[in-house]
Amino acid sequence: MKINLLSICLFILLIIPSLLFSQRGETGDKVFSNRFPPDVLNYFSEASLEIKNTVEHDIIVLIRDQYRKYVRHVYIRNGERFTLKNLPITRIYVQFKSLEFYFEDKKVSVINFGEKNIFTFFYDASMEGNYFKISEEEFFKP
């Protein structure tokens, strides 16, 4: 009886942590790849964008070009960073999903040949600041 109880307790202790984290993606995942067209890559530009997530929750970042067409998206866990490489040379708009809301950065960034750019999410986007709220439809348009 003691062996069965010990086995059950050990089993529960091993299963619970995996269940808690099983629904959470990994940084770099393409969680909405079925809702967007293929990623836009430019292997000759050598341009990159490092995205740092310093807020207390995970985010999904979406990059759009100067015509607001889809370029790339990525899932980033809180406290982590991810670098998007081989970006096209263009002006970019940064949109993101934070908790259950969708936002866009008010600033337009320029990606030039060979540049290494950095974008940092430094506080909760639902607070007033450099972001404005967008609809789910705007976020998921191709």
Descriptions of predicted regions:
Residues M1-C9:
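Bacterial N-terminal signal peptides that target proteins for export
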Residues Q23-Y67, S98-P142:
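Primarily secretory-pathway and cell-envelope proteins
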Residues R72-I76:
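Short beta-strand segments within Ig-like beta-sandwich modules, predominantly Fibronectin type-III
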Residues T83-R91:
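Short Pro-Gly-centered beta-turn/loop motif in secreted/extracellular proteins
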Residues T90-E100:
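A short, solvent-exposed beta-strand micro-motif common in secreted/extracellular proteins
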